[in-house]
Amino acid sequence: MAFVPPQAGYDRAITVFSPDGRLFQVNYAREAVKRGATAVGVKWKDGVVLAVEKRITSKLIEPSSYEKIFLIDDHIAAAPSGIIADARVLVDRARLEAQIYRLTYGEPVPLTVLVKKICDLKQAHTQYGGVRPFGAALLMAGVNEKPELFETDPSGAYFEWKAVAIGSGRNTAMAIFEEHYRDDIGKDDAIKLAILALAKTLEEPTAEGIEVAYITMDEKRWKKLPREELEKYINEILQEVKEEEVEEKQEDYSELDQNY
């Protein structure tokens, strides 16, 4: 008789809690996010920036065809991590809800309303049979009365952040935010911080492997950062990192000299 692990029954059904209060399929969906490409967001007083890792697995893929920041409405965008096919379903649903709200009320949908609708859908996929949780998290950002930045979890939970990261490089990026983010940060510094946090998660950051978009309260329309500007930011960051490494080595040598 084959050995069956004690948690097997709870493992196969998304609607059954384990004895210790967990839904294993939701945990597995979170693991899919942890293995996904890194996405980061940073908010400043007058806007929000999103930056995403583009995992281009073949040199034959056209980089321009591989979008990772999705426009939901003029004033709202989303950056996913996890199973991109699942994320695309959520993005399509968000676009539909945004259109319905605009046609019904004659005004753009508030980001908080849209986030709640998407997370209601995510939560429903943890509660009913015949479906599975979405293996994707979304960073949803935009402006209405103020800039807003939300993280949506596969469980249906959502959180508003000043700066946040999802995906495989979350811990590294969040450490950068904890160290460098400040409440009075401006647009240029916010964009640079987002790129820095993302670059720290990559072995060789390049303009082809990173996508950046931002929105301001003045224009209320998302703009993609041109490649020339992105390369400029990356070069500045790499230069600063090299200078920091040189300073650290000099400090190490000074300590060794003192010990001798």
UniProtKB/Swiss-Prot annotation:
GO molecular function: threonine-type endopeptidase activity
Locations listed in the record: Cytoplasm
Predominant cellular place of this UniProt entry's protein: cytoplasm
Keyword Cytoplasm: yes
Activity regulation: The formation of the proteasomal ATPase PAN-20S proteasome complex, via the docking of the C-termini of PAN into the intersubunit pockets in the alpha-rings, triggers opening of the gate for substrate entry. Interconversion between the open-gate and close-gate conformations leads to a dynamic regulation of the 20S proteasome proteolysis activity.
Gene3D superfamilies found in the cross-reference section: Glutamine Phosphoribosylpyrophosphate, subunit 1, domain 1
UniProt xrefs under PROSITE patterns: PROTEASOME_ALPHA_1, PROTEASOME_ALPHA_2
GO biological process: proteasome-mediated ubiquitin-dependent protein catabolic process
Any single GO CC term annotated in Swiss-Prot or TrEMBL for this entry: proteasome core complex, alpha-subunit complex
Matching InterPro entries: Ntn_hydrolases_N, Proteasome_alpha, Proteasome_alpha-type, Proteasome_asu_arc, Proteasome_asu_N, Proteasome_sua/b
The keyword Transferase is assigned to this record: no
Keyword annotations: Cytoplasm, Proteasome
Entry superkingdom: Archaea
HAMAP family: Proteasome_A_A (MF_00289_A)
Functional summary from the UniProt entry: Component of the proteasome core, a large protease complex with broad specificity involved in protein degradation.
Quaternary context: The 20S proteasome core is composed of 14 alpha and 14 beta subunits that assemble into four stacked heptameric rings, resulting in a barrel-shaped structure. The two inner rings, each composed of seven catalytic beta subunits, are sandwiched by two outer rings, each composed of seven alpha subunits. The catalytic chamber with the active sites is on the inside of the barrel. Has a gated structure, the ends of the cylinder being occluded by the N-termini of the alpha-subunits. Is capped at one or both ends by the proteasome regulatory ATPase, PAN.
Family: Belongs to the peptidase T1A family.
Name of the featured protein: Proteasome subunit alpha
Species per Swiss-Prot/TrEMBL record: Thermococcus kodakarensis (strain ATCC BAA-918 / JCM 12380 / KOD1) (Pyrococcus kodakaraensis (strain KOD1))
